[in-house]
Amino acid sequence: MTRGRVIQVMGPVVDVKFENGHLPAIYNALKIQHQARNENEVDIDLTLEVALHLGDDTVRTIAMASTDGLIRGMEVVDTGAPISVPVGDVTLGRVFNVLGEPIDLQDDIPAEARRDPIHRPAPKFEELATEVEILETGIKVVDLLAPYIKGGKIGLFGGAGVGKTVLIQELIHNIAQEHGGISVFAGVGERTREGNDLYHEMKDSGVISKTAMVFGQMNEPPGARMRVALTGLTMAEYFRDEQGQDVLLFIDNIFRFTQAGSEVSALLGRMPSAVGYQPTLATEMGQLQERITSTSKGSITSIQAIYVPADDYTDPAPATTFSHLDATTNLERKLAEMGIYPAVDPLASTSRALAPEIVGEEHYQVARRVQQTLQRYKELQDIIAILGMDELSDEDKLVVHRARRIQFFLSQNFHVAEQFTGQPGSYVPVKETVRGFKEILDGKYDHLPEDAFRLVGRIEEVVEKAKAMGVEV
């Protein structure tokens, strides 16, 4: 253990000088532990990460927690390795910070638990899985129109209060129940209150036992917010590589990862690039995203909530993220206001997996027909608003008639929302989803009322609901 001294403190950036020409490697973790000697001092237990070498024996580091109370001359110890965090089954049902320390007021992690470094190379080219496999979510609108790929990266767009969190919870629930899969949730630079609410909601809905949670929220210094995504990813990699699992990794919010990187870059004195972002923006994003993939052992499928600053999709932060995505799920406030949940926009959501050679010819054709019908309905809405339905041709009336049924049938009840809705949730296999929409498009259920299609699972439930409404089927 080589020792050094703090020689400069600039907010979250700390310079450390070592003895005898020792120079810790880049990304090494350094520890400062100081006991308060009087009431003017505070106890300090701080981890620093080496970012730059300044000469033969001096390093510039980024603090992973507040530097309050730090003074020049304090002793620093080089741990000789990067930050490492606990991995494996001990992480399930627990909440951690960026350093892998539990913050849920439960027992400490056993000392003998395995710990892995958060900085690791991406899987080698020959280790990657070559076949494209669809991840069935049981959520109709996702499986039909913007299917997720195992080992893929999905962007989740949506404003406040349109159902991002509930959709994330339902995905965690369905993967745990139907696939026995594990989920890792990384809260990056978001509100602590939301993280707390999510933890309690997951506890209530019973999915917490299959989930590890890591938080570096918006009150933390930029170093913690920048590294917490890597902490979550390291935990997910263990389940993929050592247990052969298909893991879900949720990152909320990936924009905050870039934002923290930008703050760190400025503090380190790097020249900013476009819009004031760090010059290493694409590299940092690539290092994170390339580790999220399918290998011959298992897969990490990542769902990343993306905040778009000022709704400007050309901003370098979201634009860099887009280049890595395989699918997008867009949540639309208008649909939420109509009571259609999940409020996924069927026309704006996309996936590169929606191709006949991946999902099959029938699925592809049904999805395209659904999109065409909804698109035509969208075009006709202005005419309907001005002139009314009576002015439409018979053909267009039929399009509107079916489109409204399709729109309602894209909604369904969620398991994790049972305590609010009082209705049991539904998991719909892809085959059933495709069959249901094909039959609606073919006019098999034109005689059933629109309301029978709202918030149901399989197409058989529509028929039962219509019977309960007193309609002859």
Swiss-Prot record:
Membrane topology per the entry is:
Peripheral membrane protein
UniProt-listed Pfam families? ATP-synt_ab, ATP-synt_ab_N, ATP-synt_VA_C
Q: Kindly indicate where the leader peptide sits in this chain.
A: none
Tagged with keyword Oxidoreductase: no
Annotated transmembrane regions: none
Keyword set includes Manganese: no
Q: List the record's Gene Ontology CC terms alphabetically.
A: plasma membrane; proton-transporting ATP synthase complex
| Compartments, as annotated in UniProt | Cell membrane
Alphabetic keyword roster: ATP synthesis, ATP-binding, Cell membrane, CF(1), Hydrogen ion transport, Ion transport, Membrane, Nucleotide-binding, Translocase, Transport
Catalytic function, reaction form: ATP + H2O + 4 H(+)(in) = ADP + phosphate + 5 H(+)(out)
The UniProt entry's sequence similarity note says: Belongs to the ATPase alpha/beta chains family.
Assembly, in brief, is:
F-type ATPases have 2 components, CF(1) - the catalytic core - and CF(0) - the membrane proton channel. CF(1) has five subunits: alpha(3), beta(3), gamma(1), delta(1), epsilon(1). CF(0) has three main subunits: a(1), b(2) and c(9-12). The alpha and beta chains form an alternating ring which encloses part of the gamma chain. CF(1) is attached to CF(0) by a central stalk formed by the gamma and epsilon chains, while a peripheral stalk is formed by the delta and b chains.
State the protein's purpose.
Produces ATP from ADP in the presence of a proton gradient across the membrane. The catalytic sites are hosted primarily by the beta subunits.
Q: What is this protein called?
A: ATP synthase subunit beta
What gene does the UniProt entry assign to this protein? atpD
